[in-house]
A protein has these predicted regions:
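Trp/Phe/Arg-rich N-terminal binding region typifying the photolyase-homology
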Residues: 1-133
Length: 133
């Protein structure tokens, strides 16, 4: 008899500008896979350097992350918050947690696209799948 692997895979959901649980394609895809979910938000100062957010935008981001963290906590999870280069932090968090796949919402602004490309390249080098929505 062959032993079945009962370990449930874990996917990392990288929250970017889609700071909500409802109507979130990345999160929805992870739920449909029936996997464990590791929710992560990275504040990457390099991505925002060209268009530095003002006080109102920073306030909104703080409130949105606070709300998202609270919603995730109510479901028994914890939102991981980190500051630094997403292309370094996402692969590190993924490797440290045995992540099989990283799911995220695409952005279309030039700095966001550049960050996406760097993150995808780093994850590809680490042998971790990505899927964007």
């Amino acid at each position: 008899m062959i032993a079945e692997n009962t370990t449930t895979p874990t996917f990392l959901v990288w929250f970017r500008k889609d700071l909500r649980l409802r109507d979130n394609p990345s999160l929805h895809a992870a739920v449909l896979e029936g996997c464990k979910i590791l929710p992560v938000f990275i504040w990457d100062p390099e991505e925002g350097r060209q268009w530095s957010p003002g006080a109102a935008s920073r306030w909104w981001l703080h409130q949105a992350l606070k709300s998202l963290g609270s919603d995730i906590s109510k479901l028994g999870g914890e939102l991981i918050l980190a500051k630094g280069k997403a292309a370094e932090l996402i692969p590190k968090i993924a490797k440290d947690n045995g992540i099989l796949k990283v799911l995220y919402g695409r952005t279309y602004d030039p700095p966001g696209l550049a960050t996406q490309e760097r993150v995808e390249e780093a994850l590809d080098e680490a042998g971790i799948d990505t899927e964007s929505f």
